[in-house]
Structures are given as structure tokens and as C-alpha cells.
């Protein structure tokens, strides 16, 4: 049985939801500790999940999301799936230092500038389930540096870590659609932040990013 969402979905740890992406693709996610969602590598073109079992090895990524994401995304509560139990949030995250400048990106031979990216990235320890104080001298967000200044030689090491940003609609939705296309975790925000070459299918993600920034600038 699937219950259709009529208003912004209230948060409850363990609640399993599906999210409709573009082109009629659905993805499964689970609410854990607010505001974190765990997204699974379970995609379908029909919003029916019979026979699916949520397992840790099928997790794409875990990310903090805004209420705006839940309000504007087409979300459905899935009641006939058992949630993943005893999930613990990741202990390694990527911290983006403030004071960044616009980054020039190129997709399909077209160059554009995107803003809002830090000038330096660090891999940090942030054990959010430990109860330890998160008392670094900069922002109070993590406990220790693992790699203070991520370089190209570190890309493979940090590839599965998530930025400590909070995701919004519709950029997160497009990221999830890219995960569907590639059949694995894809992270355009991190690829842009690291200065990696961007594949052609990031074009829509960059369109969304630059359009949102133009709208913000006009307010």
C-alpha cells in the first residue's frame, strides 16, 4: 500500500519515501536523523516497490536536506517496505571553507560561471552519532581534520564522502536522476568543487545551478 502525499511530509526517523524525478523515474529514500535522508540505488519507472529490501550495500549516499526539498519534490510515503534499521550517519565529510570565488565550468564546450563554492576543501571527522562536541575553531561543525587541503591525488580517497552542505530542490533531484543514468552514486557538486572535468550529461544540473543563481541575483 502506498499513501499519496497531500502536504509537506512530516519528518519521522525510519519513514520510507519515494521521490519522483524527471522523465517519470522514482527513487527510494529513508528519513534518518533530521535533516538527513539516505538515498538508495533503487530506481523504477513505476512507483511500486514490492520485493525490494533496503540494505546498507544499496545506499547511494546520505545527505542533509531542507524542508523546501520535501515540500517541492513529488514525495510519496511507502508503507509496505521495512526501513533499514540501526543506520549510523557517516563519520567522514567534506568541509568547504568560506570565501570562495566563482568557478568556470565547461560542459559540451560551453563555459559558464557558478558561484557558492569554497576556496578550499577539507576531509574532516564529524561523528554526528557520537555525542562528542563539534567544536572546531572555525564553524563548530566537526571534530578533527583528516585531510586539511584536498588535492588531486586525494580524489579517489574522498570520492564517496559528502559535502557538509544542505541540499535543496531541484539540484538534488537532478543529482539523483544522474545517479539513475549512471547506475551508481554521482556527485556533481563535489566534481565542480574539486575542479574535475564535467561530463556532457551534467548540462541540466549546470542549467539549474546557473538559473537559480541568476534568480537570486535579481531579488
Regions found by a protein language model. Give the residues of each.
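Short, isolated positions within intrinsically disordered regulatory regions of eukaryotic proteins
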Residues: 15, 53, 97-99, 159
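A eukaryote-biased signal for long
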Residues: 107-219
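Long, low-complexity intrinsically disordered regions
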Residues: 62-128
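Amphipathic alpha-helical interaction segments
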Residues: 48, 57, 69, 101-103, ...
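Short N-terminal edge-element motif at the start of the domain
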Residues: 1-62
